[in-house]
A protein has these predicted regions:
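RNA-interacting cores
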Residues: 1-253
Length: 253
């Protein structure tokens, strides 16, 4: 079953992390699922012949925080929420079981107590969906300069290439995960309100993404996959996690 896991963390004396913490959360996730599954996802993933997809996404850490600009750290002093999504039932179940039995999530060198874990299932049953990003969506192309050097061009909601790349990414994920060709129909994307640009330093690489609300319309199977495994690229690095707005169904594992 494809679900969203919402993990509630309760640091006893707060927790301080580097401002650029995506890789720390990513490592914590891999260290909290079945070893064989973690190895498969990390080393192989699901492929469409050219590109491999890990088939999970995670949000920013949400909670009250303060930033130390000099030390480039962020400190969470109270409850912290982390959301993950995946169409992989084994991934969700393994993560939930580990967190509930272990009782902690190891972020860097700190074992942070897990207060509770909620599960939510978002079922897309019509050809449109209103989404809120929980981590920035990244869509880009790698291009060549006249001298032959490569550079990365990032796109924002509203640009034609944004919609084109979003569709291409979704269809590649569909083929990689289900092993069948996706529909030729396209997903239309409409930004709702202001889209906030985020610059993230992931292990020395600067990545640009955009966060906000989006209205998607198109084939239900592609919309469902977008909700389940995230929008755009680099989902397993902490980008493109989304939730359905005003259409929640909640259960607790």
């Amino acid at each position: 079953m494809a679900i969203h896991l919402i993990i509630f963390l309760r640091p006893e004396k707060g927790i301080t992390l580097p401002q650029q913490y995506n890789h720390i959360v990513q490592a914590a996730i891999y260290n909290s699922i079945d070893t064989a599954l973690a190895t498969f996802l990390h080393q192989y993933g699901f492929t469409d012949g050219n590109r491999a997809f890990k088939m999970f996404a995670f949000s920013l850490l949400l909670g009250k925080y303060r930033i130390n600009k000099e030390e480039k750290t962020i400190t969470f002093e109270d409850e912290v929420q982390l959301t993950l999504s995946s169409p992989l039932g084994d991934f969700c179940q393994s993560l939930a079981n580990t967190l509930l039995s272990r009782g902690t999530l190891k972020l860097g060198s700190t074992d942070v107590p897990v207060e509770k874990v909620y599960a939510q299932q978002f079922k897309v049953d019509k050809e449109e969906v209103h989404l809120k990003t929980l981590s920035p969506v990244v869509l880009y192309s790698t291009l060549l300069r006249p001298d032959g050097r490569k550079y990365t061009c990032y796109f924002q909601p509203g640009e034609p290439d944004y919609a084109r790349l979003l569709n291409s990414n979704l269809k590649k994920k569909f083929k990689a995960f289900y092993g069948t060709e996706p529909t030729e129909e396209e997903v239309e994307v409409r930004p709702l309100g202001r889209q906030r640009m985020h610059l993230v330093n992931y292990k020395g690489t600067i990545i640009k993404g955009y966060a906000g609300r989006l209205h998607l319309s198109g084939p239900v199977e592609l919309l469902q996959l977008a909700v389940d495994c995230g929008l755009g690229g680099k989902n397993a690095q902490g980008f493109g996690c989304v939730e359905v707005v005003n259409e929640r169904k909640g259960t607790t594992p």
